[in-house]
């Protein structure tokens, strides 16, 4: 799934659209990538002398990947980030890195989904979390 297809599902736009491409997708699993560039707006303040991609944005990218796993084009709902448990950050993400997001659906009921999530760079885990993602009606 390319960026144009992603934009048909997610409401996010620059600078908060944090998934560049979905490389695998099924009903209970998805893999995505985010190319971290030196021109990311977040590096203006985090941190200019030694830029590190903010951990909160890694988690948001994982949540967006979960939303893309759960939803399809043309649905009149949007994903909403409802909760996070057990978030752990294990390594820095720097300009030039390719973030690999991977999510697995563990439970789905009452419009909510519990998702296990891992972010990697070059196969090395940089973050893990359990996410709660809901859906709400899109009122365009």
UniProtKB/Swiss-Prot annotation:
Protein name (record): 3-hydroxyacyl-[acyl-carrier-protein] dehydratase FabZ
Active site: 46
Organism: Pseudothermotoga lettingae (strain ATCC BAA-301 / DSM 14385 / NBRC 107922 / TMO) (Thermotoga lettingae)
Subcellular location field: Cytoplasm
GO biological process terms on file: fatty acid biosynthetic process; lipid A biosynthetic process
Record-level GO cellular component terms: cytoplasm; membrane
Pfam families hit by this protein: FabA
Record key words, sorted: Cytoplasm, Lipid A biosynthesis, Lipid biosynthesis, Lipid metabolism, Lyase
The family this protein is said to belong to: Belongs to the thioester dehydratase family. FabZ subfamily.
Keyword Cytoplasm attributed: yes
EC numbers, comma separated: 4.2.1.59
Function (record text): Involved in unsaturated fatty acids biosynthesis. Catalyzes the dehydration of short chain beta-hydroxyacyl-ACPs and long chain saturated and unsaturated beta-hydroxyacyl-ACPs.
Catalysed reactions listed for this entry: a (3R)-hydroxyacyl-[ACP] = a (2E)-enoyl-[ACP] + H2O
Domain of life, source organism: Bacteria
Molecular function GO labels: (3R)-hydroxyacyl-[acyl-carrier-protein] dehydratase activity
């Amino acid at each position: 799934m390319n960026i144009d297809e992603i934009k048909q599902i997610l409401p996010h736009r620059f600078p908060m659209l944090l998934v560049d491409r979905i490389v695998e997708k099924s009903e209970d699993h998805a893999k995505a990538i985010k190319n971290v560039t030196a021109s990311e707006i977040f590096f203006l303040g985090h941190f200019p002398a030694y830029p590190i991609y903010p951990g909160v944005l890694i988690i948001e990218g994982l949540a967006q990947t979960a939303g893309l796993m759960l939803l399809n084009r043309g649905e009149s709902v949007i994903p909403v980030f409802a909760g996070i448990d057990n978030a752990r950050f294990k390594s820095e993400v720097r300009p030039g890195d390719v973030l690999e997001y991977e999510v697995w659906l563990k439970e789905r009921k009452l419009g909510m989904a519990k998702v296990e999530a891992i972010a990697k760079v070059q196969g090395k885990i940089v973050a893990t979390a359990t996410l709660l993602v809901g859906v709400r009606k899109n009122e365009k």
